[in-house]
């Protein structure tokens, strides 16, 4: 592994990018952090659900019309450091968390938004645990459909099982959730009827996460830190071509 290759600790997000290609990881490290409306909405939901006591300190509700003009500028100055939201945005977020906040497991939590730092194969990792308690680690994921079949698709598409393995692995050293905790995901719908559902991640998925993470770390250790595309994973044939084969599910 090239010295100085690791610019910062790896994370669930960055290792997923590296699994696509080294160029994806470099782009992830280099990109400017741009806060999108979807990200703002997700943060608002997380704060309302997990840390409602921080709402007054971190948010200000703008009751006026267009976000422009002297009146709005004065409001901004009076609320420096706060995220400014509209009443309808707050109202929608409150509807979204109404069902989720009554979840039994969520109400057994002993901590939220825990920063964790640990190592796998001497490679530093960093993460943030949404909520945890004795015997469990929990994560909140917003989605359009929290039904079992639909959320399973999201779970696989976004590789949430990798995050589950990483945080369980961190707990083996840090023990913030006790011995041998289970991993849960609270899926929260962001559109009517705003259902929520708690899912336990199976041992099979945890093992799948472990397998993919360790394979990615083997590749990461081989990487010289220089830009590389899909050829890094030996997928190319002659003349830089990749053959698209029939996937197993179509056979």
Please identify what each model-predicted range represents.
Residues 1-126, 235-236:
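Metal-dependent nuclease catalytic cores that hydrolyze phosphodiester bonds in DNA/RNA
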Residues 40, 126, 159-162, 166, ...:
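Short, well-structured alpha-helical interface segments that form or flank functional binding sites
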Residues 49-54, 142-145, 172-176, 221:
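Hydrophobic/aromatic-lined pockets within catalytic cores
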Residues 90, 166-251:
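Metal-dependent nuclease catalytic regions and adjoining charged, substrate-binding loops involved
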Residues 102-108, 133-139, 172-181:
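Secondary-structure boundary elements
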Residues 112, 127-150:
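Conserved catalytic cores of phosphodiester-cleaving nucleases, focusing on short active-site segments
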Residues 122-126, 133-135, 191-194:
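Coil-to-beta-strand transition motifs
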Residues 146-158, 202:
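Short helix/strand-bridging catalytic loops that position acidic/His residues to coordinate divalent metals
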């Amino acid at each position: 592994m090239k010295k100085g290759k690791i610019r910062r600790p790896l994370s669930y997000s960055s290792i997923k990018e590296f699994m696509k290609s080294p160029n994806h990881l470099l782009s992830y490290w280099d990109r400017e952090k741009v806060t999108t409306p979807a990200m703002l909405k997700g943060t608002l939901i997380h704060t309302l659900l997990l840390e409602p006591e921080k709402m007054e300190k971190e948010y200000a509700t703008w009751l006026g019309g267009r976000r422009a003009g002297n009146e709005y500028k004065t409001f901004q100055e009076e609320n420096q450091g706060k995220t400014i939201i509209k009443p309808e945005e707050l109202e929608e977020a409150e509807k979204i968390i109404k069902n989720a906040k009554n979840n039994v497991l969520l109400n057994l939590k002993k901590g939220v938004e825990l920063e964790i730092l640990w190592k796998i194969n001497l490679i530093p990792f960093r993460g943030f645990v949404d909520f945890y308690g004795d015997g469990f680690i929990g994560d909140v994921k917003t989605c359009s459909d929290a039904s079992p079949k639909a959320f399973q698709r999201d779970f696989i598409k976004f590789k949430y099982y990798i995050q589950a393995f990483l945080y369980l692995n961190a707990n083996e050293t840090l023990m913030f959730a006790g011995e041998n905790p289970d991993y849960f995901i609270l899926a929260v719908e962001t559109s009517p009827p705003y259902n929520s559902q708690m899912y336990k991640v199976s041992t099979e998925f945890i093992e799948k996460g472990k397998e993919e993470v360790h394979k990615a770390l083997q590749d990461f250790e081989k990487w010289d830190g220089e830009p590389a595309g899909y050829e890094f994973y030996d997928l190319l044939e002659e003349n830089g071509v990749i053959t698209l084969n029939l996937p197993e599910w179509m056979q």
